[in-house]
Amino acid sequence: MPKLSNNAIKIRKTTIEDAAREHFIKQGFHATSMRDIAKTAEVSLGNLYNYYATKEAIFESIIDSYLTVMDDKLREIFAQIDEPLEPSNLRKLGEMLGELVNQHSDFWLLMYIDVLEFQNRHFRNMFDGLTDRFQRVFADKFEEARLRGDLRTGVEPASVFTAAYMQFFNYFLVEKLFGGNQHLNLTDEQALNSITKIFAYGILSEAKLAEFKKSAING
């Protein structure tokens, strides 16, 4: 039997992972058998084991690929945030996170499967140390905001930015995956504006808020 090329192996593994993902999302990890995956991928059960020793190895490979994509997407998003604490940038963050949720719904469904069936073993690093990560990314911007007197007394900018990030994520996850159907009784546009205002008014000093209000009126 001729040896498969690396490209042929990659194609075959992609087919297997696509089949597995379909089953995992539809019926969960533990309810899916290797036989189910082999049948949908149109490979023999024995051949399937040539590519993956276990079902969890398939699950982990799917998640690793998604995490790489998500990491790249989030880096692109953060690169577009000039001033992380200003209203226009917070709203832009919300818009881009909404697009991310809508474009990659399979990823979030697999995350919930991981929470239910593996106690979030495979996705834990996505949230572990999140505030510290944002502090590293935006350290200079946060410090500049402090020095300008833009922040309310006692506000920790990295913590607030993390809270805003998670709130935008949660809003779109509820709408996309849980049938929220305007669960805040607002359209997406109105929800983005409302969440932005909640955090902006909680973060910014009175002087900075007055500056933004003045620019909004003049604009």
Task: Indicate where each model-derived feature is located.
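Helix-turn-helix
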Residues: T15, A19, H23-A57, S61-I62
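Helix-loop "lid/cap" segments that line or gate small-molecule binding pockets
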Residues: E95-N102, L110-E117, I198-I203
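Short coil/turn segments at alpha/beta junctions that flank glycine-rich nucleotide-binding fingerprints
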Residues: K26-H30, H104, R148
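Hydrophobic/aromatic-rich alpha-helical bundle segments in the mid-to-C-terminal region
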Residues: L4-S5, R124, R146-I195, E206-G219
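Short, basic, alpha-helical segments at the C-terminal edge of helix-turn-helix-like DNA-binding modules
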Residues: D64-M70
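Short acidic/histidine-centered micro-motifs embedded in hydrophobic/aromatic stretches
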Residues: S65, L110-D114, G129, A163, ...
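Hydrophobic alpha-helical connector segments
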Residues: R75-D106, P157-A164, L209, A216-G219
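Amphipathic alpha-helical packing segments from all-alpha helical-bundle domains
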Residues: D71-R75, E99-Q103, R121-R148, A158-S159, ...
